[in-house]
């Protein structure tokens, strides 16, 4: 628990440091708060396959994961932003759910056993993003980098016990802010690369009663597409292309 708290504080440190500095220059004027959600497409990289059975003839058993386009998941989060000129620091803590499946094929002398195993992994994640945006009045396109710590939430699915609890990812994001005067929309996409194997080496065979496979060493990567609604405590400079004066 202490290690997890230390990791969370490490992720929050840049934001906390910036917030302390910003108190002298109008902290609330640099704050945006909102909420968002979106879809993700999980992409599995099989680092090393494992099997309960050993084929003495030398034939390799089939282990294949579902294609990225089929692995549709979702995420819901609170979004907190601090901005200074063109630099934006973003936190998006929330629940991130990933879906994918594994196809196993084992050839016995009398029959071939095929098995499709679905997975649902739900994480509480704290992504930290650093963005650089270009002010084009109503639209403010940006690009940046992201680093996230995630903790796997409990599940009744036996196969989920074969995964470690902690997960780190890094990646790149791009998108645009849309200034709608009273609210700001944030539309973005990002690719998140798993930084380590997420399979528990000690529990890879605990896939559930009757299962004929062991858990492979895998990386959990993914593409995320999100839409957020933000509320700024600072009066927006650009409302529309046509202003009304009285």
Task: Go through each PLM region and give its residues.
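Residues that define the transmembrane beta-barrel architecture of outer-membrane proteins
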Residues: 29-31, 70-76, 120-126, 139, ...
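Strand-connecting loop/turn motifs
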Residues: 26-32, 39, 82-88, 123, ...
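Flexible, solvent-exposed loop segments that connect beta-strands
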Residues: 45-67, 98-121, 151-166, 198-217, ...
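Predominantly the C-terminal beta-signal and adjacent terminal strand-loop region
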Residues: 180-246
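Short glycine/proline- and aromatic-enriched beta-strand/turn motifs that initiate or cap beta-hairpins
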Residues: 22-77, 230-238, 243-246
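Transmembrane beta-strands of outer-membrane beta-barrel proteins
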Residues: 31-35, 89-91, 126, 141-147, ...
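Outer-membrane beta-barrel proteins
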Residues: 23-24, 41, 84-86, 130-136, ...
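Gram-negative (and chloroplast) outer-membrane scaffold detector with strong preference
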Residues: 79-155, 226-231
């Amino acid at each position: 628990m202490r290690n997890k708290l230390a990791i969370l504080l490490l992720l929050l440190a840049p934001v906390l440091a910036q917030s302390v500095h910003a108190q002298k220059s109008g902290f609330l004027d640099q704050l945006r708060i909102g909420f968002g959600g979106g879809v993700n497409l999980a992409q599995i990289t099989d680092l090393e396959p494992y099997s309960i059975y050993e084929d003495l003839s030398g034939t390799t058993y089939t282990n294949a994961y579902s294609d990225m386009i089929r692995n549709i998941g979702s995420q819901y989060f609170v979004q907190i932003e601090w901005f200074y000129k063109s630099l934006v620091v973003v936190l998006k803590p929330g629940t991130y759910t990933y879906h994918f499946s594994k196809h196993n094929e084992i050839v016995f002398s009398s029959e071939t056993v095929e098995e499709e195993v679905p997975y649902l992994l739900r994480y509480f994640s704290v992504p930290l993003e650093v963005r650089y945006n270009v002010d084009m009045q109503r639209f403010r396109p940006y690009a940046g980098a992201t680093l996230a710590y995630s903790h796997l939430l409990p599940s009744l699915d036996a196969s989920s016990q074969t995964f470690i609890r902690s997960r780190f990812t890094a990646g790149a994001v791009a998108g645009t802010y849309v200034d709608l005067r009273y609210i700001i929309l944030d539309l973005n996409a990002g690719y998140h690369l798993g930084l380590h194997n997420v399979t528990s080496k000690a529990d890879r065979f605990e896939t559930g009663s009757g299962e004929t496979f062991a858990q492979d060493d895998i990386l959990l990567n993914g593409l995320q597409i999100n839409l957020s609604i933000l509320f700024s405590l600072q009066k927006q400079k650009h409302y529309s292309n046509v202003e009304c004066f009285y």
